[in-house]
Amino acid sequence: MNKLLIIDGLNLVRRIHAVLPDENDIASVQERVLAASKKMLLQHQPTHCMVVWDGNEPSWRKTLYSDYKKGRKPMPTALSDGLVNIKATLAEHDINSFDAQSEADDVIATIAMKMISNKGEVIIVSTDKGFSQLPTKNLTLWDHFNQQVFDVEQYEKKLGIEQYQMLDFIALAGDSGNKIPGIMGIGPKSAADLLNKFRTLANLYRSLDNLGAKQALKLAEGKEIARISYKLAQLQCDIPLNINLKQFRINPITN
């Protein structure tokens, strides 16, 4: 069975960079990213590995909702300029990169789902909880920084929902980290309570007459922003990609 390790490039690099005392010390970032990548290869023993990077084109999500990810700290210039050397260092060790046109998340989701549909296994290395919406069969979410599998079931219990309700939950409650708005006045607890009772967003909107007047009004007035929030949170798993998996094949790692 083919086993693909997909590393969310900027997620890894920016977190490594953030803990360094000198933000201009890109050589240390380079060394640590390579060491981390080698460690993952040794741990997971994949047949293929790729590092997926965000591109520079504007995200379609930003076009849909201009405040998407608003206020997020820009990448330091030294790090941005150093990415080309980081990619080159990885490539020297047969860890090849794939550059997305815009956000890496949709590319990662597309590649992962295609691999799984072809009876392969996938490990996604990222701390981005958005990947928890993907089907879990033959898919592992690996948190390199905590050295553990991201437990989707535990995350669902924490939110008080089931996996299939994840996008409906964000449509209602939003996602502050990505500046996805959700419906004003509907917080995580209310969203979970509503989904526990009505199961899906569609069924909830068919049942507004069964709610109190105040809550029903909030939901009615927020229907369009809920639709937008759902779309913003939803990973695209069908992006056309010109990619040959053979270029990402790696030799077995022994040390």
Curated annotation (Swiss-Prot):
Cofactor comment in the record? Binds 2 Mg(2+) per subunit. Only one magnesium ion has a direct interaction with the protein, the other interactions are indirect.
Q: Which InterPro entries match?
A: 5-3_exonucl_a-hlix_arch_N, 5-3_exonuclease, 5-3_exonuclease_C_sf, DNA_polI_H3TH, FEN, HhH2, PIN-like_dom_sf, Xni
Sorted keywords for this record are: DNA-binding, Endonuclease, Hydrolase, Magnesium, Metal-binding, Nuclease, Potassium
Region (Interaction with DNA) location:
185-190
Which residues take part in binding K(+)? L172, A173, P181, I183, I186
* Residues engaged in binding Mg(2+): D105
Limits of the 5'-3' exonuclease domain: 163-253
Q: Which SMART domains match?
A: 53EXOc, HhH2
Q: Give the superkingdom in one word.
A: Bacteria
The UniProt similarity line reads: Belongs to the Xni family.
Q: Which PANTHER family match?
A: 5'-3' EXONUCLEASE FAMILY PROTEIN, FLAP ENDONUCLEASE XNI
Q: Per its record, how is this protein called by name?
A: Flap endonuclease Xni
